[in-house]
Design a protein with these regions (language model features):
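Extended, compositionally simple hydrophobic/Ser/Thr-rich segments
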Residues: 3, 9-13, 18-150
């Protein structure tokens, strides 16, 4: 569905499966309370767009930029996320085994990781980690912060 007119509206869509979701220009996609069982999904939120989803997935590719917000709950084997320019990833309630996170220019990610984590942080970004993953091949530059929660 491609809605291009700028108006406040609710659109209800029913579909058997998802491959990707994209929200932009302050739009919001709520894909719950349903739990989506997926092998792979791509999520993209830009320019204030917001996506909320609950899922069980093997692979999640997430991208947010320019104040985009991704809120993900459920379970995933692998999470790959790229966040730029004040984007946010709220995934404390996404139980993830492996994660690869790239943050820059004030982006913030809150994640739960159990096994392996790699990250690259630039430009005053912040990563909040829940869990006790093995951290591999990671970089922290330009005033970025890492916070470990118990």
């Amino acid at each position: 569905v491609n809605i291009v007119k700028y108006a406040s509206m609710n659109v209800l869509i029913s579909m058997p499966t998802l491959g990707s979701l994209k929200a932009s220009n302050h739009s919001r996609i709520d894909a719950w309370p349903q739990i989506w069982n997926l092998r792979t999904i791509r999520l993209e939120a830009t320019t204030g767009g917001q996506i909320r989803i609950r899922l069980k997935a093997e692979d999640i590719q997430a991208e947010a930029r320019t104040s985009g917000i991704l809120e993900i709950k459920g379970e995933a084997q692998n999470l790959q996320a790229i966040l730029k320019t004040a984007a946010r990833l709220e995934a404390r309630e996404l139980e993830t085994q492996n994660a690869d996170i790239q943050l820059s220019i004030g982006a913030k990610a809150e994640i739960q990781v159990n096994q392996r984590l790699t990250y690259d942080l630039y430009g005053h970004s912040r990563l909040v980690i829940k869990g006790n993953p093995q951290i591999e091949n990671s970089h922290n530059y330009s005033g970025s912060r890492i916070i470990k929660e118990k």
